[in-house]
Amino acid sequence: MADLPPARSLTAAELMRQLGFKFPAPALELATASRAPAPRFDTPLSRELRPAPERRLLHVTNGDSAAGTIRLSGVSGEVSVTADLLHEGPAPGSLPPERWRKVRARYLAESGYDDYESALAALTRWDRALEAAHSYDEVVLWFEHDLFDQLLLIRALDLLAGLDLGGTVLSLIQADDYLGHLSPARMAALLPERQRVGEDQKRLAREAWRAFGSPDPRRIEAVLAGDTSPLPYLEGALLRHLEEFPAVADGLSRSERQILRALDRGAVSFEEVFRATQGMEERIYRGDASFHRILRELAAHPRPLIRTEPGVNGPLRALRISLTPTGREVLAGQDDWVRIRGIDRWLGGVHLQGPEAAWRWDAAAGRLAAG
């Protein structure tokens, strides 16, 4: 049985991403993750980056909650959002942008996050804002330390690095807390701390984004084997992504195993299980709608790993969840979830499909293993 990090005692706080999608389920009160050390960059904030009334700024951040706080903070400039759930579903790097957005919109619609047309419109709007970066004096990227944000960051930097920006300055704020939690005053105080994006950061982001979208996940391991210090939170995020590959020991992703472990420890309600699994994360990145999708997969098989009452698609606050005998066997490493049900899962550019997974995560070795 693969090891999990111990659960922490956390303070409850609202962590609504408000991604711009119409989630099918109500949001719950979530828990905050522990704070990681603030990143340090070699390039100090120079005087020409300090905002002046006549400078045109574009702020790009991870969701409507953070965007609203930036607007309330009084900082000058326009605000845009980029908030795709890149840690879920197909993200093949070989597709041109228009086709890529359609693939993403189809996944988001099929998963119940939004209807296809609305999702496609949002994805297109977010990209168009980045593509217009050259019309601003400065573009400020506001992102957090978790997997959700780090994937958004490397995609944004990859897109921006491919544009002719002229004299536009790119700067970056990497928060060690969740931006949606911050007060407008604290958000305004972060702006002078922003750092100019250098060539090392652009180069690393492009390499990492292309590795994420590759059908060969060993390219991610190659990125991790190199110097990731220009983006201090990227290493942890990419490792967390690799942990979503089915494990050698039991065929479970880390997220799936955390759910079974929470149930084994006595959690029963949706909220209890959700909060328990958030407590097992070093950096929280998954919302309740995404979590609900995993529950549906664990329950939707003739030999399910969990049972739910009154039903997995019922009201979330009414759900009661329990481990099945098969779930206990898989959690104990006595059976294998992939071999029970097969697999059809996209992780970035990797499509795991069939009765066996082509790639698995070996937690003991800290690396991928061919299936």
Label each PLM-derived region with a short phrase.
Residues 187-264:
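A conserved mid-domain beta-alpha-beta active-site/ligand-binding segment of alpha/beta enzyme cores
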Residues 171-194:
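Short, conserved secondary-structure transition motifs
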Residues 272-278:
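A short acidic, leucine-rich amphipathic alpha-helix
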Residues 111-162:
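Long, hydrophobic/aromatic-enriched structural stretches that serve as scaffold segments
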Residues 278-312:
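Charge-enriched amphipathic alpha-helical scaffolds
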Residues 301-371:
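C-terminal engagement modules used by replication, chromatin/transcription, nuclear envelope/ESCRT
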Residues 32-116:
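A structured, charge-rich N-terminal accessory region that forms the first stable segment of a protein
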Residues 262-272:
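Short capping segments at the starts of secondary-structure elements
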